[in-house]
Amino acid sequence: MGLLKAVVVLNGAADVKGVVQFTQEGDGPTTVTGKISGLSPGLHGFHVHALGDTTNGCMSTGPHFNPLGKEHGAPTDDNRHAGDLGNVTVGTDGTVEFSITDSQIPLSGPHSIVGRAVVVHADPDDLGKGGHELSKSTGNAGGRLACGVVGLQG
């Protein structure tokens, strides 16, 4: 299958913007690298959502991508949504550069994330362990600050 590449351009609330790149070699894990700016310092939930629909901004991207019907969790948990990528840690300058490697977000096949949305949230993802009523579905990560649709690159 060779190397697959995809990209998301994030846009949203106020000055939040960024670019996230995805690469996958064969059936191996997907590497996610990105830079996002315009965020408040601290942790922000970072997820793949089920739909690539941004007609109503980030609100129309649906729930977390969850093809296997599991509960929300941390990226290292066995019981997690495929789209649960945890948090990105934003510095005092409002920017974050990150690299994540994950085996549940392929760029091809029946569970491909191509055509789905990536969303950056206002608050930290509690990784399903916060005890809040939303912990097991969204990680209680709050509002959707920015989003974009995953598209294949040549």
From Swiss-Prot:
Alphabetically sorted, this entry's keywords are:
Antioxidant, Copper, Cytoplasm, Disulfide bond, Metal-binding, Oxidoreductase, Zinc
Pfam families recorded for this chain? Sod_Cu
The cellular location(s) given in this protein's UniProt record come to:
Cytoplasm
Look up keyword Zinc and say if it applies. Answer: yes
The species this protein was found in = Pinus sylvestris
Q: Which reactions fall under this protein's catalytic activity?
A: 2 superoxide + 2 H(+) = H2O2 + O2
Question: What function is annotated for this protein?
Answer: Destroys radicals which are normally produced within the cells and which are toxic to biological systems.
Protein's name according to its UniProt entry: Superoxide dismutase [Cu-Zn]
| One MF term in the entry's GO annotations | copper ion binding
- What are the required cofactors? Cu cation; Zn(2+)
Q: Which CDD domains match?
A: Cu-Zn_Superoxide_Dismutase (cd00305)
**Binding of Zn(2+), residues:** H64, H72, H81, D84
EC code: 1.15.1.1
Gene Ontology cellular component annotations, sorted alphabetically: cytoplasm
